[in-house]
């Protein structure tokens, strides 16, 4: 089919609101479309306003997110990937409504989504709120000057970086004046270039050159938007949940992804290394961040492969610093060995770190969704920072919401925190909060 097929009219004469977890603010109304039907129909020309409703976000749907007005998911929490993307694109979103409520919500032709209150309301008629999301037409105004009320100079030696998931966010990136891109999530950023297939299969089918050209063009746009500020490129994590539904993943050992995947099959890492070096990483202040490093051996495997790549290119020294993600508890015990092996910096990922320490899932909803506000996570981050400071490794803390309690932040700064990276909608608030807190103290 070449168009979106509306769902049949609800048999319910009256609706009752469904409570979930609001993860991306705003109130929006629109016509209901099933996420599963969207995947099966592959629509070509959807007309807003559209509210997508489904179990969870899958890769096939991501290119359509820029065209929808609201998102409702049965699964997920505040740090789930669907929530992260919705916030970056400024789409009102409610997650965790529960599978039992999906059929009920899908029986209505219209919905309103309250991303602030976490409420979804089924409607028989078109709601009054029917505008497209503001993000679908990003502002083109000139950014405020540094040290304005919008962007105050921080009274502490701390870098504020932006986390980037989508190419469409580049205009917002320019408007928010971050100190650079603290984390470019390659899995999301390049997902549409894989055309529904796992990257390993796509490369094996002979698309290496095509992918390299497309990767380079897209990454170059990011560098031009922030030059001369740094960009921290997180390498593709082939174990990522976002890739598990793609064609060809069945041949890959999903239980051992992360950086081990690059040791098992370096084809994706080779593609990334070629692109990063073609861009002249020495002049562009690029950093390669290896994902989900569990052991020193995994890092050494990636490092050795990179050194072999350099020799093949006729280079003897690397202009590309190698960083790692600190996402699993084992990193805390191995930092000295990792530094000795050549790690040059660390990005702390509290979303994964929290779920592995506390036995939680980032895709779950409800009160047990912690990130930076749990005392145990706070203590783990403090220990990581004290050790990286002792080893003279610059460290960035990734925060989805940008909300860090002031007393925690003071502890992190004393322990040697170098930078924070957060989602674009939270950059201004984070900078202003830090400035106001220190001026008041």
Each language-model region and where it sits:
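Acidic, glycine-rich flexible loop/linker segments
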Residues: 2-179, 183-184
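Conserved alpha/beta-domain cores
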Residues: 141-441
């Amino acid at each position: 089919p070449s168009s979106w097929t509306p769902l049949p009219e609800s048999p319910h004469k009256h609706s009752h609101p469904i409570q979930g977890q609001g993860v991306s603010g705003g109130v929006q109304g629109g016509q209901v479309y099933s996420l599963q039907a969207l995947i099966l129909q592959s629509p070509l020309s959807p007309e807003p306003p559209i509210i997508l409703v489904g179990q969870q976000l899958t890769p096939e749907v991501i290119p359509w997110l820029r065209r929808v007005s609201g998102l409702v998911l049965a699964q997920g929490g505040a740090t789930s990937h669907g929530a992260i993307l919705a916030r970056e694109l400024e789409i009102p979103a409610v997650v965790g409504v529960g599978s039992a409520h999906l059929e009920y919500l899908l029986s209505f032709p219209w919905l309103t989504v309250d991303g602030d209150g976490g409420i979804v309301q089924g409607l028989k008629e078109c709601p009054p709120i029917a505008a497209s999301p503001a993000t679908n037409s990003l502002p083109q105004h000139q950014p405020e000057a540094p040290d304005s009320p919008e962007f105050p100079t921080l009274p502490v030696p701390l870098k504020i970086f932006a986390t980037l998931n989508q190419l469409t966010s580049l205009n917002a990136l320019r408007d928010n004046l971050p100190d650079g891109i603290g984390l470019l999530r390659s899995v999301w950023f390049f997902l549409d270039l894989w055309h529904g297939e796992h990257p390993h299969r796509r490369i094996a089918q002979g698309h290496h050159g095509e992918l390299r050209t497309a990767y380079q063009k897209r990454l170059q746009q990011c560098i031009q938007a922030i030059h001369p500020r740094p960009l921290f490129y997180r390498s593709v994590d082939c174990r990522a949940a976002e890739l598990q539904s793609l064609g060809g993943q069945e041949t890959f050992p999903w239980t051992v992804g992360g950086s081990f995947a690059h040791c098992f099959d370096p084809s994706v890492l080779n593609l990334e290394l070629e692109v990063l070096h073609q861009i002249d990483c020495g002049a562009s202040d690029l950093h390669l961040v290896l994902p989900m490093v569990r052991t020193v051996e995994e890092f050494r495997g990636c490092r050795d492969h990179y050194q072999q790549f350099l020799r093949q290119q006729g280079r003897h020294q690397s202009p590309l610093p190698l960083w790692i993600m600190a996402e699993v508890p084992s990193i805390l015990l191995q930092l000295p060995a990792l530094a000795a092996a050549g790690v040059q910096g660390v990005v702390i990922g509290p979303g994964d770190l929290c779920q592995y320490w506390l036995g939680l899932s980032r895709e779950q909803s409800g009160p047990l969704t912690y990130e930076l506000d749990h005392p145990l996570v706070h203590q783990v981050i403090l220990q990581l920072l004290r050790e990286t400071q002792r080893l003279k490794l610059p460290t960035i803390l990734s925060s989805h919401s940008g909300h860090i309690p002031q007393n925690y932040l003071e502890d992190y700064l004393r322990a040697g925190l170098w930078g924070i990276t957060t989602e674009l909608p939270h950059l201004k608030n984070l900078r202003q909060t830090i400035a106001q807190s220190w001026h008041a103290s």
